[in-house]
């Protein structure tokens, strides 16, 4: 672990207002010859990886990286860190999905079909934040002729909207949707089924 602090007089500098600090640290003896990562903990308590390079100066090896802020940094074994970060991210995503609020809406298209759309209500950046961690986000859309029962899956899609073109003309249908998060083919988390508050006629 390395704590990096800069001071002007008695004032600590934490951010560089768009600038960067260039840092060179000695390679820890126990990590010499191993693949390493340089990480720090962000404001959400998540480990983030910083790009780095290893340089040889004289007979010694050093780690070089840039940072837009000072923090507590760690140089760690790559294999061990990747496993821990993967577990941490999965737990974070599950927590997000459990507390997230989604809104499902229906609108009529120009061809009189019904467009169903789901969006995160609690955070506009939540889906993009999840994707930035390397996960795949998919959406499932359900329909029923009854508001409280009988919902059947219509579509699983990577898009957050779905156009329902089939159904009996004049009949009212009710729609639900949910959000799923995958790590490759493995389901990591999913939201509860969220219902559109009103029905839509074909």
Model regions: which residues?
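Proteolytic processing hotspots in large secreted/extracellular or virion-associated proteins
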Residues: 1-44, 79-81
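C-terminal beta-strand-rich structural cap/linker in extracellular carbohydrate-active enzymes
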Residues: 62-85
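Beta-strand-rich modules
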Residues: 164-184
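Short beta-strand segments within Ig-like beta-sandwich modules, predominantly Fibronectin type-III
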Residues: 53-55, 153-159
């Amino acid at each position: 672990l390395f704590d990096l602090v800069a001071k002007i007089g008695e004032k600590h500098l934490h951010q560089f207002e768009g600038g960067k600090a260039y840092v060179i640290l000695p390679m820890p003896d126990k990590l010499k010859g191993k693949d390493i990562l340089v990480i720090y903990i962000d404001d959400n308590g998540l480990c983030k990886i910083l790009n780095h390079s290893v340089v040889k100066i004289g007979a010694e090896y050093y780690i070089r990286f840039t940072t837009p802020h000072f923090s507590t940094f760690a140089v760690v074994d790559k294999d061990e860190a990747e496993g821990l970060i993967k577990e941490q991210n999965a737990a974070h995503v599950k927590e997000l999905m459990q507390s997230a609020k989604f809104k499902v809406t229906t609108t009529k298209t120009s061809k009189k079909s019904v467009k169903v759309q789901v969006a995160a209500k609690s955070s506009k950046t939540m889906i993009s934040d999840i994707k930035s961690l390397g996960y795949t986000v998919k959406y499932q859309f359900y329909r029923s002729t009854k508001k409280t029962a009988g919902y059947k899956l219509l579509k699983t899609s990577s898009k957050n909207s779905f156009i329902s073109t089939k159904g009996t003309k004049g009949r009212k249908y009710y729609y639900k949707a949910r959000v799923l998060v995958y790590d490759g083919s493995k389901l990591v988390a999913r939201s509860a089924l969220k219902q559109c508050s009103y029905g839509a006629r074909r």
